[in-house]
Swiss-Prot record:
Gene: MAPKAP1
Organism: Bos taurus
GO cellular component entries: cilium; cytoplasm; cytosol; early endosome; early endosome membrane; endoplasmic reticulum; endoplasmic reticulum membrane; Golgi membrane
Stated name of the protein: Target of rapamycin complex 2 subunit MAPKAP1
Region (SIN1-type RBD) residue spans: 279-353
Function field: Component of the mechanistic target of rapamycin complex 2 (mTORC2), which transduces signals from growth factors to pathways involved in proliferation, cytoskeletal organization, lipogenesis and anabolic output. In response to growth factors, mTORC2 phosphorylates and activates AGC protein kinase family members, including AKT (AKT1, AKT2 and AKT3), PKC (PRKCA, PRKCB and PRKCE) and SGK1. In contrast to mTORC1, mTORC2 is nutrient-insensitive.
Positions bearing Phosphothreonine: 86, 398
Location of the SIN1-type PH domain: 382-487
UniProt modified residues of type N-acetylalanine: 2
Length: 522
């Protein structure tokens, strides 16, 4: 090991030792940096300093002439040495040698024509094609599974299996629904079938998915192969079908409805099934009436009372005041709850609170309910749209589409290219909940082609009125449909509206009476 303290000698040693062996470029950086610093310390103009330069054989100073190696090219980054011609040639020969190894040379020889027929026959020997015996090996797992699940192959609802969302929970929007099956036996219908569907599916697709899962699980009885033979109804938590509302529209997406409990009901569309008519019992209450559907006349009056109270209180817990049933024709006489409907010989009853009496004339309504009126009342909850004209304050009209169903009334403007140019015709869509509806009255009927009706509803603690006009037949149908809906619902807003209207009428009557009394005294 040698210790040197002369930077010039050290730099010269690095320069000569790493001319061809430095591939990192580190020596170039050392030479450039230290030579610059050394030049600043020992400028070349200073004479007599023998320690800062090395004398060559020709007597000239060589201290900084060879400060940088001639074989290292200075660049922005590290130095890169160019390859010599010999190295490039050796690399080319190596690649050619590797390519020759990959090639195979075959020597061409002339075919010997003196070959016997036996030798030619041995070249293409005839093989015996015998039928192989059937393989009696073990069956594959797929074959075994297909034999165990024959219903999967013969399921007529396989096309709806793509809407099954059980494998997409957490990754895609899904909806879990409990479906009751009234077509089951009396014990199986109490337990719902849980279905997980894609949120993008329609109601028709959900019906097909329910039928597919029903068939895959091997349930009985078998379903009709036609999906259109079924519909979905709103159901209570105990499986009771709510017939006051129409079935869900098959073309609507399922995510539009927030119901978690539904019932799959068969449509009675064939002529043989149309004779199966439902039985309805009318229950009068203080602010309207309800139609309770029963399967037969063997049902007890206690079951009818429970349904009536549940229908009156809705989703609230059945607690608080107790009620009893009375015949419409026999006031203040309670009905025996253990008796059957058949033994009562009546189809109309009154719901009266315990420890109270029914006043005369409180429930005086037409007790004669024909089947046509019942059908009109039930169909009034089905959605139907009408094209009418909405009358504004300045007496100009706007064409709108009036959609009426059992749960709400929708008013959508019908815009046309001609009407869109007028700045005042900018009617916004309006949606009115049925619980906020108060009244629907015929305002004017001039001719069969022109009539006006008024719709009253509650908005922000204030009663608002909307006026519409159309032909007389359409107006009468709308008024009748809305009034059927209002009579079948015990709306608080409607009761308050009539109470306020009655108070105004009484105040006006008393004022006119006092005025007449004063004029008589004079």
């Amino acid at each position: 090991m040698a210790f040197l303290d002369n930077p010039t000698i050290i730099l010269a040693h690095i320069r000569q030792s790493h001319v061809t062996s430095d591939d990192t470029g580190m020596c170039e950086m050392v030479l450039i940096d230290h030579d610059v610093d050394l030049e600043k310390i020992h400028p070349p103009s200073m004479p007599g300093d023998s320690g800062s330069e090395i004398q060559g054989s020709n007597g000239e100073t060589q201290g900084y002439v060879y400060a940088q190696s001639v074989d290292i090219t200075s660049s922005w980054d590290f130095g890169i040495r160019r390859r010599s011609n010999t190295a490039q040639r050796l690399e080319r020969l190596r690649k050619e040698r590797q390519n020759q190894i990959k090639c195979k040379n075959i020597q061409w020889k002339e075919r010997n024509s003196k070959q016997s027929a036996q030798e030619l026959k041995s070249l293409f020997e005839k093989k015996s094609l015998k039928e192989k015996p059937p393989n009696s090996g073990k069956q594959s797992i797929l074959s075994v599974r297909l034999e165990q699940c024959p219903l999967q192959l013969n399921n007529p609802f396989n096309e709806y299996s793509k809407f099954d969302g059980k494998g997409h929970v957490g990754t895609t929007a899904t909806k879990k629904i409990d479906v009751y099956l009234p077509l089951h036996s009396s014990q199986d219908r109490l337990l719902p079938m849980t279905v997980v569907t894609m949120a993008s599916a329609r109601v028709q697709d959900l019906i097909g998915l329910i039928c597919w899962q029903y068939t895959s699980e091997g349930r009985e009885p078998k379903l009709n192969d036609n999906v259109s033979a079924y519909c979905l109804h709103i159901a209570e938590d105990d499986g009771e079908v709510d017939t006051d509302f129409p079935p869900l529209d098959s073309n609507e997406p399922i995510h539009k409805f927030g119901f978690s409990t539904l019932a799959l009901v068969e449509k009675y569309s064939s002529p043989g099934l149309t004779s199966k008519e439902s039985l309805f019992v009318r229950i009068n209450a203080a602010h309207g009436f309800s139609l309770i559907q029963v399967d037969n006349t063997k049902v007890t009056m206690k079951e009818i009372l429970l349904k009536a109270v549940k229908r009156r209180k809705g989703s609230q817990k059945i607690s608080g005041p107790q009620y009893r049933l009375e015949k419409q024709s026999e006031p203040n006489v309670a009905v025996d709850l253990e008796s059957t409907l058949e033994s009562q010989s009546a189809w109309e009853f009154c719901l009266v609170r315990e420890n109270s009496s029914r006043a005369d004339g409180v429930f005086e309504e037409d007790s004669q309910i024909d089947i046509a009126t019942v059908q009109d009342m039930l169909s009034s909850h089905h959605y139907k749209s009408f094209k009418v004209s909405m009358i504004h304050r300045l007496r100009f009209t706007t064409d709108v589409q009036l959609g009426i169903s059992g749960d709400k009334v929708e008013i959508d403007p019908v815009t046309s290219q001609k009407a869109s140019t007028k700045f005042w015709i900018k009617q916004k869509p309006i949606s009115i909940d049925s619980d906020l509806l108060c009244a629907c009255d015929l305002a004017e009927e001039k001719s069969p082609s022109h009539a006006i009706f008024k719709l009253t509803y509650l908005s922000n603690h204030d009663y608002k009125h909307l006026y519409f006009e159309s032909d007389a037949a359409t107006v009468n149908e709308i008024v009748l449909k809305v009034n059927y809906i209002l009579e079948s619902r015990a709306s608080t807003a409607r009761a308050d509206y009539f109470a306020q209207k009655q108070r105004k009428l009484n105040r006006r009557t008393s004022f006119s009476f006092q005025k007449e009394k004063k004029s008589g005294q004079q």
